[in-house]
Amino acid sequence: REIGLIIVDEAHIVTTWGVGFRPDYWYLGGYINRLRNQIQTKWNKDKKVAHFPICAFTATAVNGGLDDSVSETIISLYMENPIKYIGYVKRDNIRFNISVRKSNKLANPVYEEKKATDLISRINEWIAANTKTIAYFPYASYAGDALRGIKSFAGKTFDRDKVALYTGRNLDDVSTAVLAERKRKAFDEFRSGEKPVMLATKAFGMGVDINNIVNVYHYAVTGNLC
């Protein structure tokens, strides 16, 4: 049976997360190239050169500029003169609210204390209003500190029974099975609304289909915005 079409969903992963998180995406271009350039020899006369189109879809790839992941993906997948369809990227139902804390030196104790205080204040507001919210952290340890109320978050109170935690790291050094069960439980509690606030890293995002999330809070500027 010959291949008629290859569809690559979440195509930005080919050149971003593909290296360490989704290796199948990283090697996909090489596999496609081998399929298209198989050589017939006396030992494999049945081999045929495969001719098929490739469709790649993504909602988050950057087109142009220093972080041009669109061009990188085209090169990685060995796409020749592809036709690009770029949709309307502005989401009219999304509003950005940026809070800037002035400090002579970033990441000093006073600065971190202010950031933590701001976040806890917002968490209490979200819990009181019962608005489903994801608070993203650059590191799993920060998310864990916030939930446990330690380091910059020491002495700050909120209803921890209303807050879930989901990161890609094993913060408590538990078994793989226990960690997987904790993640599943956190996801279910957040989706059902039992815990309306989720403290997470980018590990919580892919494949999450929850249509009533109201707020997405970034504790630090994301890498793509730096």
Please provide the spans of the model-predicted regions.
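Conserved RecA-like helicase motor core of SF1/SF2 enzymes
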Residues: 168-170, 189-226
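Catalytic phosphate/metal-binding cores of nucleic-acid and nucleotide-processing enzymes, i.e., regions
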Residues: 15, 26, 30-38, 90, ...
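Inter-lobe coupling/hinge segments of SF2-like helicase ATPases
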Residues: 91, 95-113
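Conserved helicase motor
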Residues: 88-89, 137-142, 163-184, 201-205
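Conserved strand-helix element at the start of the C-terminal RecA-like helicase core
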Residues: 63-65, 123-153, 164-167
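Post-DEXD/H (motif II) to motif III coupling segment of the RecA-like Helicase ATP-binding lobe
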Residues: 2-5, 10-86
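A short beta-strand-to-loop transition that corresponds to the Sensor-1 phosphate-sensing loop
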Residues: 10-11, 56-65, 137-140, 200-204, ...
